[in-house]
Amino acid sequence: MNFWVTFIRLIVVLSIVFAFQIAVAKAACVTHEDCTLLCYDTIGTCVDGKCKCM
């Protein structure tokens, strides 16, 4: 039973990370301010038209 709990948690974490990477990849930006909301508490920068969260 412990194996299944760990397995399900792993799937959930990977799904969240994967979805977040897609959201960041799709976010087009012109200035650093465009990335501020996307990156929440971290510093967002605009690199080659895409947001990068530090």
UniProtKB/Swiss-Prot annotation:
Site residues, May block the Kv7.1/KCNQ1 channel pore: 50
Name by which UniProt lists this protein: Potassium channel toxin alpha-KTx 28.1
GO molecular function, one term: potassium channel regulator activity
Family: Belongs to the short scorpion toxin superfamily. Potassium channel inhibitor family. Alpha-KTx 28 subfamily.
Gene Ontology CC: one annotated term: extracellular region
Extent of the signal sequence: 1-27
Mutagenesis / variant outcome for changing residue 41 to A: Shows a weak decrease of activity on Kv7.1/KCNQ1
Tissue expression from the record: Expressed by the venom gland.
Organism: Isometrus maculatus (Lesser brown scorpion)
Mutagenesis / variant outcome for changing residue 52 to A: Shows a weak decrease of activity on Kv7.1/KCNQ1
Function: Selectively inhibits Kv7.1/KCNQ1 channel (Kd=11.69 uM) and inhibits Kv1.1/KCNA1, Kv1.2/KCNA2, Kv1.3/KCNA3 with a very low potency.
Keyword tags: Disulfide bond, Ion channel impairing toxin, Neurotoxin, Potassium channel impairing toxin, Secreted, Signal, Toxin, Voltage-gated potassium channel impairing toxin
Effect of residue 50 to A: Shows a decrease of activity on Kv7.1/KCNQ1
Coiled coil: none
Domain free text: Has the structural arrangement of an alpha-helix connected to antiparallel beta-sheets by disulfide bonds (CS-alpha/beta).
